[in-house]
């Protein structure tokens, strides 16, 4: 068993999730984790790039540099907290910060910032990054990548297991006995809810969904939001902030007398029902499980609404299966680093649409 570090900064832009795991590729144990905050100014600068308000190459290059230092500092903080030497770590798997993902364009591309040369040089640890573009070079979406890891953890169930990750975007992995893994992004997760509460209350997220719970669902608005053509597209598919953001959302609420808390309730229901519309297709009998991870697993009202819409499902978090729901994605990128170091496949072509299996990622040596 070797030790790997996983670094994840998702579409919620709420900081760096850092983990150390021990793995041989088939078994993975979480040894420890740390959350490392992102400077508010860096978050604001990133949001400007992600929403297209800032396209200056000099600014983007500087953010790439700043993020490299942030990820390196998160790594050193984690090692110090757990009293583990950098020499004990085989490699770091760094997802980077996605600022644009365009898999369906004439010239498909994805862009993650966070200079891995800086991470490797500053920590003294070989770093694996740029996980998505090899899959895209093979005709895939480059996302989601986590279903391959979910299959390692939860694969071959007797009944159907649906692993639901709710970060800024929601994605699902469908695990069924004797069937290929299915996985794709269902649509928004916390992203729109977080943006809305930040704009109206100055808070970074809606704790427990309390503000959404205080509102009433606006059916007219909900139905309009669900007309987005993304939801009718067949999988494999993936999405991000470039499709679902407040600028896109503004067209539906302009000059409407909606109360902010009612809009929040509707955004939560938008997330829930676009998830449910997808997962219900994979129900088998009355023994289907929905295992939730990511930040959305802490939103009590959201979890209640999922159970409401899926009365015959067992809805729980992955914590109930001894897998930390907060660190699933960071653990996945530690595992992806292991796969790359050993030249093992780490994508699921049935999930991403790639033409074949491949070992994803580029190695940035420390020396």
Swiss-Prot record:
Q: What is its EC number?
A: 2.7.1.170
For this UniProt entry, which segments traverse the membrane?
A: none
MF-aspect GO terms: ATP binding; kinase activity; phosphotransferase activity, alcohol group as acceptor
**Involved pathway(s):** Amino-sugar metabolism; 1,6-anhydro-N-acetylmuramate degradation; Cell wall biogenesis; peptidoglycan recycling
Record's keyword terms, sorted? ATP-binding, Carbohydrate metabolism, Kinase, Nucleotide-binding, Transferase
Q: InterPro entries in the record, alphabetically? A: Anhydro_N_Ac-Mur_kinase (IPR005338), ATPase_NBD (IPR043129)
Q: Which GO terms describe its biological process?
A: 1,6-anhydro-N-acetyl-beta-muramic acid catabolic process; amino sugar metabolic process; peptidoglycan turnover
Q: For binding ATP, which residues are annotated in this chain's numbering?
A: 10-17
What exactly does this protein do?
Catalyzes the specific phosphorylation of 1,6-anhydro-N-acetylmuramic acid (anhMurNAc) with the simultaneous cleavage of the 1,6-anhydro ring, generating MurNAc-6-P. Is required for the utilization of anhMurNAc either imported from the medium or derived from its own cell wall murein, and thus plays a role in cell wall recycling.
- Quote the protein name from its UniProt record: Anhydro-N-acetylmuramic acid kinase
